[in-house]
Structure formats: C-alpha cells, structure tokens
C-alpha cells in the first residue's frame, strides 16, 4: 500500500494511476476509486492508534481510561468526518505534489528508541542541559548550533543511557557530571523521543494559508475545506515544529512569520495540549524563551 505525505498527493497520484491504466489498456473497465466510507474491519477501527502506547512519562500516568478522558483523539476510531494523518517514513512516500520537500525530511518522527553519537565542541561542551524527573533523565535545553542540536536531540526527549550506562535514578548533577567526564571524541546516548507527537503535511492555498488558527502556540480552530482540514490537523494540540524547526517558546507573531515564509508545502509537528502542558510544567518554561535552539536543522 502506498503512503503519502498529504491528501493532495494521494489524490494526484490516484489520477496519475488512472491515466496510466487507461493509456495502457483503454478498452478495459473504467478505473474505480473505492469509497473511503467502506465498512470497518472486524476490530471496528479503521485506523491504527495514532500514537505509541505509553504508561508513564514524567510522572504522568497514561492508562487507557485517562487517555480516553484527557486525549479522546488518541484512543479508538475517529469520529465521523474526522480526518486522520499518521507519521511514517518519508522514504516510502508517494509525493507527486509535495515532491522531495526538505521540511518533511526535517520533521520526520522516528517513534521508538534511537541512538545518537556526538562529540564535544572546542570548549569541551555539547550544548545540552538535562533534568531529573521522577527517576528519569530528560532533555531540558538544546542550545543552537551545538553538537546536541546537530544530532537531533529535542526538548522533552528522555535519555535512557549515556555511554552504555543506564540513567534511571540519576540526579541532574550526576547526569551532567557523566557528560563532563566523558571522552570528548565520542559520546553515545540512547534516546526515547518525546511522546505522542505526529506530523501533518499541508499545502498553502492561493492566499498563502493552510487553514488553521492558533493562540499561544495552541491550535484553536480549523478552516473548513482547507488543507489543514483535509489532512487531519486537530485542535487542542500544540505546535512543536514547523518544517522541522523548533517553535516551542516562541511568540505567536514569530510562529506566524515562520509559517508565512515557509514554502508552499508546510509540515508541522504537533502534540496533544494535555501532554505538552505537562512537559512544560515540569521543565522550567523560562529557559525555553531565552536559550532554546530555534535554528533550522540541516538534512
């Protein structure tokens, strides 16, 4: 089954397929598009879960009942008429409209655990501040153009291991001490990406808009029949990135400027407000506004 970064890409590819099939065998039956409202599969859920399962994060207990109450968009089938998008590898996407867009590559989410290797800069630093929360070590700050920024570490990521040592139960001081004493040429970190993120790729209309309104970084409404609506953007979600560029901690005017200067294809990374606000509450929000990395990552 083909995967697409946006609904526009899917529709154009369907037309291309139909034209190709007709050209190859014009006498054959007409190409029929299957109605998206087809019957649900036996499990009653047309869509897989949008987000990975997670029982604990920064002291937040996320059992099924609490997820249903606080984030109804996460569990079960979507309401009638609600559109859904889910993150997937850009390497396997069919994108006749979007093309090889750099924003999609920068914004790609790799759910699960990953390993990064970084080295210290000329000052012996990696540009990373960690914080101990409920026996876990989390990324509190990534500085611009630092080694930590270059390997893709993000605010809210959990550090599971440093150079093969489990970080569970460490204090913030111990984590920083281990990094300070580590060999500068190679530091290996095992990372669990911040949870419940997803990306949505949209296309600007003739007026340069994708069709959503936000306040304090939170998506508050979706414009009917816009690209945002067609591609499953949801309200009550916070914008974390635009085309892979971190916008957490920026003012609305700054976020609007980034959106307006983006190309015709815009990929945003969002997180349920319930989770986002919990992370911010535990992470000292004043640091975000003054020191956090907001540069455009390289791909």
From Swiss-Prot:
<dbReference type="GO" id="GO:0005886">
    <property type="term" value="C:plasma membrane"/>
</dbReference>
<dbReference type="InterPro" id="IPR001478">
    <property type="entry name" value="PDZ"/>
</dbReference>
<dbReference type="GO" id="GO:0005856">
    <property type="term" value="C:cytoskeleton"/>
</dbReference>
<dbReference type="GO" id="GO:0030307">
    <property type="term" value="P:positive regulation of cell growth"/>
</dbReference>
<dbReference type="GO" id="GO:0005829">
    <property type="term" value="C:cytosol"/>
</dbReference>
<dbReference type="GO" id="GO:0002091">
    <property type="term" value="P:negative regulation of receptor internalization"/>
</dbReference>
<feature type="modified residue" description="Phosphoserine">
    <location>
        <position position="6"/>
    </location>
</feature>
<dbReference type="GO" id="GO:0005895">
    <property type="term" value="C:interleukin-5 receptor complex"/>
</dbReference>
<dbReference type="InterPro" id="IPR036034">
    <property type="entry name" value="PDZ_sf"/>
</dbReference>
<keyword id="KW-0206">Cytoskeleton</keyword>
<keyword id="KW-0007">Acetylation</keyword>
<dbReference type="GO" id="GO:1903553">
    <property type="term" value="P:positive regulation of extracellular exosome assembly"/>
</dbReference>
<keyword id="KW-1003">Cell membrane</keyword>
<dbReference type="GO" id="GO:0005546">
    <property type="term" value="F:phosphatidylinositol-4,5-bisphosphate binding"/>
</dbReference>
<dbReference type="GO" id="GO:0005925">
    <property type="term" value="C:focal adhesion"/>
</dbReference>
<dbReference type="GO" id="GO:0008284">
    <property type="term" value="P:positive regulation of cell population proliferation"/>
</dbReference>
<dbReference type="GO" id="GO:0070062">
    <property type="term" value="C:extracellular exosome"/>
</dbReference>
<keyword id="KW-0256">Endoplasmic reticulum</keyword>
<dbReference type="GO" id="GO:0005789">
    <property type="term" value="C:endoplasmic reticulum membrane"/>
</dbReference>
<dbReference type="GO" id="GO:0007346">
    <property type="term" value="P:regulation of mitotic cell cycle"/>
</dbReference>
<dbReference type="GO" id="GO:0042802">
    <property type="term" value="F:identical protein binding"/>
</dbReference>
<dbReference type="GO" id="GO:0046982">
    <property type="term" value="F:protein heterodimerization activity"/>
</dbReference>
<feature type="short sequence motif" description="LYPX(n)L motif 3">
    <location>
        <begin position="50"/>
        <end position="54"/>
    </location>
</feature>
<dbReference type="GO" id="GO:0140311">
    <property type="term" value="F:protein sequestering activity"/>
</dbReference>
<dbReference type="GO" id="GO:0005109">
    <property type="term" value="F:frizzled binding"/>
</dbReference>
<feature type="modified residue" description="Phosphotyrosine">
    <location>
        <position position="47"/>
    </location>
</feature>
<dbReference type="GO" id="GO:0030335">
    <property type="term" value="P:positive regulation of cell migration"/>
</dbReference>
<dbReference type="GO" id="GO:0030511">
    <property type="term" value="P:positive regulation of transforming growth factor beta receptor signaling pathway"/>
</dbReference>
<keyword id="KW-0965">Cell junction</keyword>
<dbReference type="GO" id="GO:0031965">
    <property type="term" value="C:nuclear membrane"/>
</dbReference>
<keyword id="KW-0963">Cytoplasm</keyword>
<dbReference type="GO" id="GO:0010718">
    <property type="term" value="P:positive regulation of epithelial to mesenchymal transition"/>
</dbReference>
<comment type="subunit">
    <text>Monomer and homodimer. Interacts with SDC1, SDC2, SDC3, SDC4, NRXN2, EPHA7, EPHB1, NF2 isoform 1, TGFA, IL5RA, NFASC, SDCBP2 and PTPRJ. Interacts with PDCD6IP. Forms a complex with PDCD6IP and SDC2. Interacts (via C-terminus) with TGFBR1. Binds to FZD7; this interaction is increased by inositol trisphosphate (IP3). Interacts with SMO.</text>
</comment>
<feature type="domain" description="PDZ 1">
    <location>
        <begin position="115"/>
        <end position="194"/>
    </location>
</feature>
<feature type="modified residue" description="N-acetylserine">
    <location>
        <position position="2"/>
    </location>
</feature>
<dbReference type="GO" id="GO:0000122">
    <property type="term" value="P:negative regulation of transcription by RNA polymerase II"/>
</dbReference>
<dbReference type="GO" id="GO:0045121">
    <property type="term" value="C:membrane raft"/>
</dbReference>
<dbReference type="InterPro" id="IPR051230">
    <property type="entry name" value="APP-Binding"/>
</dbReference>
<keyword id="KW-0597">Phosphoprotein</keyword>
<dbReference type="GO" id="GO:0005654">
    <property type="term" value="C:nucleoplasm"/>
</dbReference>
<dbReference type="GO" id="GO:1903543">
    <property type="term" value="P:positive regulation of exosomal secretion"/>
</dbReference>
<feature type="binding site">
    <location>
        <begin position="251"/>
        <end position="252"/>
    </location>
    <ligand>
        <name>a 1,2-diacyl-sn-glycero-3-phospho-(1D-myo-inositol-4,5-bisphosphate)</name>
    </ligand>
</feature>
């Amino acid at each position: 089954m083909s995967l697409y970064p946006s609904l526009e890409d899917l529709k154009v590819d369907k037309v291309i397929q139909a034209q190709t099939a007709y050209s190859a065998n014009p006498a054959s039956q007409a190409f029929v598009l299957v109605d998206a409202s087809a019957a649900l599969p036996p499990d009653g859920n047309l869509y897989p879960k949008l987000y990975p399962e997670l029982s604990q994060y920064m002291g937040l207990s996320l059992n099924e009942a609490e997820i249903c109450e606080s984030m109804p968009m996460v569990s079960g089938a979507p309401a009638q008429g609600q559109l859904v998008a889910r993150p997937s590898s850009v390497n396997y996407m069919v994108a006749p409209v979007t093309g090889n867009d750099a924003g999609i590559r920068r914004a790609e989410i790799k759910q699960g655990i990953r390993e990064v290797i970084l080295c210290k800069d000329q000052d012996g630093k990696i540009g990373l501040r960690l914080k101990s929360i409920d026996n876990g070590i989390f990324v509190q700050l990534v500085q611009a153009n630092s080694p930590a920024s270059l390997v893709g570490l993000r605010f809210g990521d959990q550090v599971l291991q440093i150079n093969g040592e489990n970080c569970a139960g460490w204090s913030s001081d111990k984590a920083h001490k281990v990094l300070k004493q580590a060999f500068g040429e190679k530091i290996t970190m095992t990372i669990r990406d911040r949870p419940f993120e997803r990306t949505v790729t949209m296309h600007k209309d003739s007026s340069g808009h994708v069709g959503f309104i936000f306040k304090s970084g939170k998506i508050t409404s979706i414009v009917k029949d816009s690209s945002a609506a067609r591609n499953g953007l949801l309200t009550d979600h916070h914008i974390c990135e635009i085309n892979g560029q971190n916008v957490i901690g920026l003012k609305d005017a700054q976020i609007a400027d980034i959106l307006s200067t983006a190309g015709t294809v815009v990929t945003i990374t969002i997180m349920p407000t319930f989770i986002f606000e919990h992370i911010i509450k535990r992470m000292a929000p004043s640091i975000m506004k003054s020191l956090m990395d907001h540069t455009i990552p390289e791909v």
